[in-house]
Design a protein with these regions (language model features):
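An aromatic- and glycine-enriched ligand-binding surface/loop that stacks and positions planar moieties
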Residues: 1, 50, 83-84, 99-106, ...
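C-terminal substrate/ligand-recognition segments
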Residues: 245-356, 496-498
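Long, intrinsically disordered, low-complexity segments
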Residues: 77, 167-229, 313, 317-318, ...
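Structural signature of alpha-solenoid helical repeat junctions
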Residues: 21-28, 35, 74, 94-101, ...
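Single conserved hydrophobic/aromatic residue that forms the stacking wall/gate
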Residues: 2-12
Length: 498
């Protein structure tokens, strides 16, 4: 990471010595500022305060001995770099070059500003050690407005849109389309080419429903019903008895059955493997751990045979920013600023995500989940709605932990929680597997043997009798390596609690 920062710094420094003037030079300068902001943002998320540098240092101890800048200083500097990047980067109407452009920088700016605005708001509210003590309500609102404004700039251009198709396949298709160059939703992405040894192994591990992983019941239950209502109570309990019923697009938001495997779906080309049940009794990479097998990213329709079982031969693209991110950032920033006043704008922003899969328009009252077991049941209804929409639309895309951290929500979502999967005892899974699964050996369940309903636990929970643990006075940031403390002459102070 630090080497990458040095590369960006050198490019910015040396641009002053370049005699060439023109669009290519402008693009290079914009990219240098973008990537400096991007690398600092990654450090910022992980470690909080860091030293902001605007020149390349000589490898001399004295030059390394600098204190960390405050959170607000670092956040403001990242946003300033992105403003410069936006000024210099070119405008693009598709992602065919796979280079950053103005709207990619705006997308990152909206993410950074939303991250810091919500981080400061919620960490200050819970009085954790991690917010900037100089932050004010006005400063928090400023970040949220910047997040909304950057996203709105992209929206107002009218260049990008949500890709559409069959409501029961369009969402899934986005993540397994190998060439997204002219997809109207994708701002920036990475293309894989397995024939030239540029690939990954997602399809290999997931194309029989295993992968030594699985989705949680918490995620599955958060998808609304087809009518746009919370999936709770007797309706939920009844749908869990026959495996797969709760996943059906006739009952639930169709994004669920395009993210989690449902009986009858192809996982390999030409009908070679049709999903029936999660492989709970398999071993190693072929096992599913929760009863909910992952479908998203599985290239069931590949024509490149090595993708099916080859290590490093999967080619599903890596999307960095898509228009859905813009809409979600805009909606959340508006909800945080004033959900009631911005209700119509929030609904309008998120409507395309619902329309893609044939879901009804957002209705904050209809969707408000008051179930006592729902973790955000006391949240403002506007914020609850946009948080749910973010979780559903971006499921399994790697952003959930960062959301939990910026919302200071570990006390609600992590501490003391035991993650669970599908209903086992009291469902058709129990009948299907019979004696092939033995509790305490290759099956772990909630409750006790006398309970009529027991859910899958994805690990041996005897090692976690009190559920997941997370120290809210320490774990929102990573520890700084002792080597870094030494290099800075102890000008850097270790993060709280470490």
């Amino acid at each position: 990471m630090l080497r990458s920062l040095v590369g960006s710094e050198m490019c910015i420094r040396d641009s002053d010595n370049c005699e060439e003037i023109g669009p290519e030079m402008e693009q290079c300068i914009g990219e240098a500022y973008f990537f400096r902001a991007c690398y600092y943002y990654r450090l910022f998320v992980n470690y909080g305060e860091v030293t902001w540098l605007t020149k390349v240092l000589d490898p001399i101890q004295e030059q390394m001995e600098r204190p960390r800048n405050s959170r607000l200083e670092v956040a403001d500097s990242i946003l300033a770099d992105l403003d410069i990047a936006i000024e210099h980067l070119n405008t693009q109407t598709n992602s065919s070059t796979m280079r950053v452009h103005k709207d990619v920088a705006r997308a990152l700016k909206s993410e950074v500003a939303l991250f810091e605005g919500t981080w400061e708001k919620y960490h200050r509210a819970k009085n954790t050690p991690f917010y900037d003590k100089k932050v004010t309500d006005e400063k928090i609102s400023s970040y949220l407005r910047q997040a909304a404004d950057a996203a709105k700039d992209v929206i107002d251009e009218g260049v990008w849109s949500i890709s559409k198709g069959d409501p029961n396949t369009a969402y899934r298709d986005l993540f397994i389309t190998l060439d997204l160059s002219h997809n109207p939703e994708v701002l920036w992405w990475k293309k894989y080419d397995a024939a030239n040894n540029i690939g990954h192994s997602v399809t290999r591990y997931l194309n029989k429903g295993g992968g030594t992983c699985g989705a949680s019941a918490s995620l599955v239950d958060d998808y609304l019903t087809k009518e746009g209502k919370p999936f709770v109570g007797s309706e939920r309990d009844k749908a869990k008895v026959m495996y797969g019923d709760e996943l059906s697009p006739d009952l639930r938001d169709p994004r669920l059955s395009q993210t989690i495997c449902m009986p009858g779906q192809d996982l390999r080309p030409n009908g070679e493997f049709v999903f029936k049940l999660p492989p709970l009794n398999e071993e190693s990479r072929n096992q599913n751990t929760t009863g909910y097998s992952i479908l998203k990213y599985v290239e069931y329709n590949t024509t490149y045979i090595p993708t099916i079982d080859g290590e490093g031969k999967s080619q599903a693209p890596a999307i960095q920013f898509r228009y859905a991110d813009i809409l979600l950032n805009y909606a959340e920033a508006l909800a945080e600023l004033d959900g009631a006043a911005n209700a119509s704008k929030i609904k309008e922003a998120l409507r395309p995500l619902r329309e893609r899969v044939g879901m009804p328009e957002m209705d904050f009252d209809r969707e408000f989940n008051t179930d006592p077991d729902y973790p955000f049941n006391k949240l403002d209804k506007y914020i609850q709605a946009v948080r749910r929409e973010r979780r559903i639309e971006k499921a399994l895309e790697g952003s959930r932990l960062q959301d939990i951290l910026r919302w200071a929500a570990a006390d609600i979502l992590i501490i003391g929680k035991t993650p669970t999967g599908a209903l086992f005892k009291g469902s058709s899974l129990e009948t299907a597997y019979g004696e092939s699964l033995q509790e305490g050996e290759n099956l772990f369940l909630t409750g006790t043997p006398s309970d009529s309903k027991r859910y899958i636990i994805p690990f041996n929970n005897k090692h976690y009798p009190n559920g997941w643990q997370f120290n809210p006075e320490r774990d929102y940031l990573l520890p700084i390596q002792p080597r870094m403390l030494s290099l800075t002459g102890n000008q850097w102070v270790q993060n709280p609690g470490w």
